[in-house]
Amino acid sequence: MAARRKPAVLTGFAPIGDSRATLLILGSMPGAASLAAHQYYAHPRNAFWPMLEAVWGIPAALDYATRVRAVVAARIAIWDVLASCQRASSLDADIEHGSIVVNDFEGFFRRHPQISMIAFNGSTAQLLYRRHVMPSLPTELRQIPALRMPSTSPAHAALSLQRKVQRWRELRRAVPAAST
């Protein structure tokens, strides 16, 4: 019987956003399609870019570099909780917990002092942040308001795109400075 091979270590991306960002949207870890394309939310069935179009008016049909510039102009930052991990598939459930390395959030918040809201793109991002990031943050950084939003992943199709957009619009109203 052959020994089961451990999945390769996957490494995420640098954050999108500049020091003017007021909203941080956090995922867990890029999926296989995103890693292959070197783009956040690259899976064609992920609703992230259509949601941003519906809520912030950033056209999903734009090329990736133009969308990124529009996100930055809207004072939005995009990142993931995990810097690296081992995962056998694109599913969050397949993340090997002993392999988790989180991003440097204290450094990120120091470089992005206007962040006034964190939006978790799904429950796994929220759980990973609470479990692996919050305990190491200074008190003032633990107090940044945070909301769990419906995941835009195609693996989470319990809500329609219309309902997801409705929830994300509620977030936009809570962070009025994050606008185009």
Spans of model-derived segments:
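Short, hydrophobic/glycine-enriched beta-strand segments
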Residues: 22-28
